[in-house]
C-alpha cells in the first residue's frame, strides 16, 4: 500500500512540474505548501497528506485567509511536538532517512497517535543510528571453525580400533595366502569386534564425563500446562498396574506442579476375564486417593497395531487436551518429582520433543534378573551418560518412562506401513526408535536426562521369558534395517537403528565365526595364527568386552554412597565377578536363541502378540523345550571337535560347555532360590534393595487394596453376559452339579436374596459348577442385586498406612 501511494505521489509531482500550473488562491497555496512539506518528510499516502495539510491550514488562521509561510511554521511546530512526544529529548537526533522510511510504513500514527507510534518504533530498527527494521537488515554472520559431528566422532574411535585389530588378523592370516574362507572369517571378526568397540567407547565417554563438575541447571517451579500420564497395558496383572499408578498419583499430589497431570490406563486386553479384573482394580483405584489428579480407564474395541496403535488412538482422540504426555510401560514406576521435572525441562526447552529418563532395574528375584540388575546398576549410569553426550540432541527413545511433546508427536510420528509382508514388512513393531528418528528428521530434539533418578522398570524374571521378549524386539529391530536407509533421517538416528539390529545379528554371526574358525583350524596343516598374534587378539577382544564392566566398577567404587549401597567394596567386587562369570556362561545360550530367532524371521516367521509374564514361575518343561536345541548343538560341537579337531576341544569349552548344560543352567538362572542364596551373602546387591525407595514400598503395600476378592469375581461373572457365556462354555457338557439339588436350590435362593458377599466359598463353587443355575442367577441378579455397585465400588476401600518417613 505504501509503495502504491509513493508511486501516485511521484506521478502527481511530475505532472505538476510539467504543467507549471499557477496557484492563485492563498488557501490552496498554503495547503499545497504544507502537503509538499509533509510529503518530503516521508509520508507517501497522498490522501493522508492532503487530510493533514487541510487540518493544519484550517487550524492556523481560522476565519481568515491563511498565508503559506504561517501554515508551514504551524506544520513544523506540529511535527516537532509530535517527535518530542514520541522520542523525548533525542527527537533532534533522529536520522532523516530512517524517519522517511518509518513515516512511509506507518503514516496512520503521524501527528495523531503517540502511543501507537511508540509501539511501532520499537520494532522498526534504530532511529538514531539509522538502521533499517530487522526484516530489512542483513543478518550478522559468524565464521566458526568446522567441528566434526558427534556421531562421526563416536564412530571414529571404534572404527580405528576395529580396523587395526582386523588388519592385524588379516596380516597374520595372509602369511600363507588368504583364502576366501579366511577373508569371510576376518569380516565376521570385524563385525563382532566393531560392535563391542562401540560399547567400550560409549562406556569410556560416560566414565570420564562422570568426573565433570558441570551440572544441569535447576528448573524454575512454574505452573505446568495440562499433561497426561499414560500407561498402555495388555493382559497385565491389574493389581500390580493399579497399585503402581495409585502410588505415582500420591507422589504427584505431593509434588509442586503434579496437579497438572491426568492419568490414563489404555487397555488392549481381549480376554473378557482379564478385562473384568482390570475394571475391578480400576474401580477400586479410582475411588480412593487425590481427586485433583483424575484416573481414567479405556479399553479399545479393536486393538490394531498393538502398543503403537493403542497410543496412537489415544493421542488422536484426546491428545488435543494435553501439551505433554509421560508414557509408561506396564511395569514402570516413576517418582512424582521425576515426572514433573521431565515436563519442566521440556517447558524450558521449546525445541525438545522427547526427553527420556534413565531406567533403573528393580524387583529382581531370580539369579538371571538379579545379575541383570547388578550390571545395570554398576554400568548403566555410565552408559547413559556416554550415550547422552555422544548422541546429544539426536538421542534415542526407549518406548516408556519418557516425556513427549504431544503436538510434535502428532505432527511427525504417524508410523508408515512398510512395503511387503511381515515379518520384515507391514506394521512397524518397534515404534520407539522410529518415532525418535522421525522427530529428529523434522528438526525436533530428542534428549536423555541422564542426571535424573527415580525411574524404574522390571526385567523378565526367567530366561525363557527374556528370550520371548527378544523375539518380539528382534523382528522390530530387523525392520529398522529397512527404515535406516530412508531419505532425510539424521545420521545418528541411522546409527541407533543399525547398532540395535546388529545386537541381534551378533548371535548368528558369532556362531558362524566359531564354526568357520573351527573348520579352518582343523583343516590347516599349521596353526591358523601364531600364538603371539592369537594372544594379542584375545587380549584386545577381552578388553572391549570386559572394559565397560571394569570402568563401571571403578566408577562405583569411587562413589562413596553408591559403593555402600551395593554392600561395600568387597561385596561389590565379588558381585561384579559373579555377574561377569554368569554373563559369560549364558552368552552361548543367548547366541543360539538369537540365531534361531533371526533364522525364523528370515524364513517368514511372524511374532505373536502375547502378554509379558513378570513372575518367576517358569515350568520345567518350558525350559526343556526352550534349551533342547542348544543342548543338541553343544553335544554335536564337542563330538565333532573330538573327532576332527581334538586340540580345539579345550579352547572352545567356554562355548560348548554351557550349551551341553543349557537345561540345568537355565533352571538355575530362572530360579528364585539361587538369587536369594546370593542375596543372603550380599552378592548382586543393588541400591534398590539396601535402601528401597518409599515409592516402591508404597506400591508394594497398595497391591492388597487393588486385589479383587472371590465375591467380586463371582459378582462380575453373574452380571456380565460375556463372562457368563465364557464360563458356561468351559463347563463339561452333561456334568452333574457339585452338590445335591436341595443344596443347589438353597445356594441359588441365598445368592438371589442376600447377594454375592453372603455366599461361602463352597456355595460359590456349587453355583459355578451348574450352568443352568448361573443362567438363572444372571436373570435374577439384575432384578434384585444393587447393580449400581457393579459400576462403582459400593464400599470405599481404605488405603493402607503410608510408610513412616525417616
Describe each region flagged by the PLM.
Residues 6-36:
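A short, charge-rich alpha-helical start-of-domain segment used by transcription regulators
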Residues 45-63:
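Conserved RNAP core-binding helix
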Residues 67-97:
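Σ70-family region 2.3-2.4 aromatic/basic alpha-helix that recognizes the −10 promoter
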Residues 106-221, 500-530, 545-552, 647-679, ...:
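N-terminal membrane-anchoring/stem segments of glycan-assembly enzymes
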Residues 126-158, 174-183, 212, 216, ...:
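Basic/Trp-rich segment in TM-proximal cytosolic loops or flexible interdomain/linker regions
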Residues 201-488:
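Internal catalytic domains of large membrane-associated glycosyltransferases
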Residues 214-232, 566-582, 683-692:
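Membrane-cytosol interface motif
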Residues 331, 667-734:
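Cytosolic/matrix-facing juxtamembrane and C-terminal tails of multi-pass cellular membrane proteins
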